[in-house]
Amino acid sequence: MPTTSTDPRAAAATLLVPGTTCHGFAVERRETVPELDSDAYVLRHTASGARLLYLACDDENKAFAIGFKTPPADSTGVFHILEHSVLCGSAKFPVKEPFVDLIKSSMQTFLNAMTYPDKTIYPVATTNEQDLYNLMDVYLDAVFNPAIYTKPTIFEQEGWHYELDLPESAEGEGDGSSASLREGTLRYNGVVFNEMKGALSDPMSVLDDAVNAALYPDTAYAHESGGDPRAIPALTYEQFLDTHARHYNPSNSYITLYGDLDVDRALAFLDERYLSQPSATSRRMDAAVAAGEDPSALAPNPLGVQAPVTCEYKRIEMATTPENALVGLGLVLGSALDRKRTIAADILFEALLGSNEAPVKKAILAAGLGGNVVSYTAAECLQPYELIMLQNAQPGVARELRRVFQDACRDLCEHGVPRERLEAIISSNEYDLRQRDYGIADGVAIACDALSTWLYDDDAATLALKIGRASCRER
């Protein structure tokens, strides 16, 4: 039933009562998320299987996102190519570049798409509600009814194709003779192919890929989800279409709505325009493993158990100068669903490595193994990990880096990490949480955060939103 309240939280509370159904969506539960000054509603579309999370709050910068579980089976970059390709026209919007047209004509405050190691997300944000529906319409038609099935050139343009480079003399003649063609050089070209050539020319990206392959053998994380230029040309058009058909369907989707919006209208729009259409309900997957529902596709061992490391030391040669040499040390932190543990580990590593005076970083630099140490926590996967990188590394220091790191950690286990340092880091994180300065539209950042746990457990849609860094004071 329509609501008349101008308070989005009150309107949602009246409309979305757990145990009831609204526009084909079963309302499974309601939770308060005080960290975001919002109420969260978890719903499931009965006919299509689509999951939906609505965060009711008074933010006028409304957001919508649809994501899909997309664990790669190889490094052809098929999901990255799909991310580009579905935004090159659709059944309802048969224009060459609807994405570019939206940037020019919309009141959007965010408009993009992102490929992660195990998911692909299409988020938008705007302060105008009608504009939000326009954006939703374009994005939903793009992901469910893309033009890729009738226009193979989209795959060739965004993925890869052959291109013939002719000598300057032959180009000038332009006669297209067989002699001129024989003098040409055949090469690969394509938007994603070239993008990944650039990305993987960075030694840090190559090192990160190698560490992932070592930490997570026989899983989706062992592959480069963006695509390895050496593997991209192995992808066929037929495989590309089959991958879209198996993964880009409502039963494998995660939809987020956020902000001060008419949720009754939004749910009706989703149900009537897309999720209850025959094409949507008939595409419910029988083989759940195709969308990565089988945990073994993402993690080799039960959650909470570190993945076996089959590659302790690996050397990769690149055409780069010696001063760019890197050594990496990767540490699996557990499960993304153990949110407190992951955040506590992030805070701990900041205390150990976050500055030149941090004890572990100081010990590594004092050992003269390299010029600098950088580290980060990678939380966008089922088993988060910490990657410690030694820059300007001296030859043959991999084993020594591990020894120095372990010795420094043993010393800290015996004597402890200075409490005042941990307090300072937690206080800084608490301030950042209060400020909520994500650098992008809040609703978009929150949709991405939610998927960092929701993707792996339907009951964890709000876990990443409710357990913040501040809760680590309890530990």
Model-derived regions, located:
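Active-site recognition of the HExxH zinc-binding catalytic motif
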Residues: 76-88
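Charge-rich, well-structured scaffold segments of protease-associated domains
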Residues: 2-23, 71, 85-302, 317-338, ...
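Short pre-active-site segment immediately N-terminal to the catalytic Zn-binding motif
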Residues: 67-77
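Short, conserved catalytic-motif segment at the N-terminal edge
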Residues: 60-64
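N- or domain-start disorder-to-order transition segments that initiate the globular core
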Residues: 2-59
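Short, conserved beta-strand segments within well-ordered enzyme catalytic domains
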Residues: 53-55, 65-67, 123
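Short acidic-hydrophobic surface loop/beta-edge motif
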Residues: 39-46, 307-320
